[in-house]
């Protein structure tokens, strides 16, 4: 099944996405976040129905892009499963 994602709203450093039936959002704690396109692509790549993601900028690379830490939490199972992915 293919899921389409759209940026629904942007308020400060919080962005919300519509992915199929569920609202999903990520919050960047970086003061200057200029990688919204890359974050959206990563979000689409790792997020499926029943999963929520939370992304946090944990540093900056040599080119000034944020180094992101993703929390992927499964919400439709009996146990929540959480993993972290460095992008």
Residue ranges: model-predicted function:
Residues 1-29:
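Short aromatic-glycine-(Arg/Gly/Cys) micro-motifs in beta-strand/loop hairpins
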Residues 33-36:
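Conserved aromatic
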Residues 40-87:
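Short, mixed-charge low-complexity intrinsically disordered segments
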